[in-house]
Amino acid sequence: KDGYLVGNDGCKYSCNTYPK
């Protein structure tokens, strides 16, 4: 996933750099 999903889908920051 791409974009900023804080708390969603297990992403802490941008899913690009920090995937679940």
UniProtKB/Swiss-Prot annotation:
Domain LCN-type CS-alpha/beta: 1-20
Compartments, as annotated in UniProt: Secreted
Tissue specificity note: Expressed by the venom gland.
Cellular component, GO, one term: extracellular region
Entries under InterPro entries matching the protein: LCN-type_CS_alpha_beta_dom
Keywords of this entry: Amidation, Disulfide bond, Ion channel impairing toxin, Neurotoxin, Secreted, Toxin, Voltage-gated sodium channel impairing toxin
GO MF term set: ion channel inhibitor activity; sodium channel regulator activity; toxin activity
Highest taxon of the lineage: Eukaryota
Function: Beta toxins bind voltage-independently at site-4 of sodium channels (Nav) and shift the voltage of activation toward more negative potentials thereby affecting sodium channel activation and promoting spontaneous and repetitive firing.
Domains (record comment): Has the structural arrangement of an alpha-helix connected to antiparallel beta-sheets by disulfide bonds (CS-alpha/beta).
Record-stated family: Belongs to the long (4 C-C) scorpion toxin superfamily. Sodium channel inhibitor family. Beta subfamily.
Protein's name in the database: Toxin TpF21-Cocle
Organism for this UniProt entry: Tityus pachyurus
Lineage: Eukaryota, Metazoa, Ecdysozoa, Arthropoda, Chelicerata
